[in-house]
Amino acid sequence: MVMTGGGGGIMQAGHEGAGRENSFGLNIQLPFEQQANPIIEGDPKLIHFKYFFTRKLFLLKESDAVALFPGGFGTQDEAFECMTLSQTGKFGPVPVVLIDRPGGDYWRSWSEYIDKQLLHKGLVSPEDPSLYTVTDDLVVACNAITRFYQVYHSSRYVGDRLVIRLKIDLSEVEVEQLNANFSDILVTGRIEKSQALPQEAQDETFDLPRLVLYFNQRDLGRLYQMIAAINNMGTPSPEERGHPERK
């Protein structure tokens, strides 16, 4: 399922690739510029928004991955909203990929600005660039998304504990490696293997193995780095490898 702003250009291309039946369009009501593309026009899954902030909420709320392409102020607004929500734990974890045309420098220049004006001045954490991937290669972009769900499935909080659902069970040695490398993100205790907690009895992911930890809810870049480390552990079967949307 693909969700776009519902307009032309790259938004229409997303709908063409997914097909009308697998597309949502979240259009914005403007007196100029933004018209629904012919793929989604007239479809009940085309939704019109008066305000940008509610549109952004719906774009992100159910998304399992975000792909951003070069654009104007609206694109920058959506990009920084996505980064802010990811950095503060209000959204995700999900893969966020900034995709340019081959040889393009739109996102590379953006990334250089982030490094110079934010990262080097201590306005964001050194790990925050781990929240996103910048590329002009579609293969790299696709791999960044699929690789994010190689072993990691999804996560939620149960009280103060972060529960990370996995597609395969990790070994004790692998969990020990995570504790050795990521103890800095813990408030207390250790990263531990677990089955579903009692509060998850009705969860559709009940049978999946889990990791449970008291995450400090601050170092989200480090959490993304830990997810990357988890995805380098083990090799799920083709049946286990499917995206969370395809349960």
State where each predicted segment sits:
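Conserved thiamine diphosphate
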Residues: L57-L68, Q117-D136
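Glycine-rich beta-alpha loop segments
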Residues: M1-I28, F206-P209, I230-N231, T235-H243, ...
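Short, acidic/small-residue loops that bind anionic groups at enzyme active sites
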Residues: N22-Q34, F69, M83-W110, P126-E127
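Short acidic-hydrophobic, aromatic-tinged amphipathic segments that line or gate anion-handling sites
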Residues: K45-T54, S130-A141
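Active-site/ligand-binding-proximal alpha/beta "capping" segment
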Residues: F49-L98, H153
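Acidic/glycine-enriched connector segments
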Residues: M1, G9-P70
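Glycine-rich, charge-decorated loop segments at or immediately adjacent to ligand/cofactor-binding or catalytic sites
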Residues: M11-G14, G104-Q117
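SAM-dependent methyltransferases
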Residues: L131, L138-K247
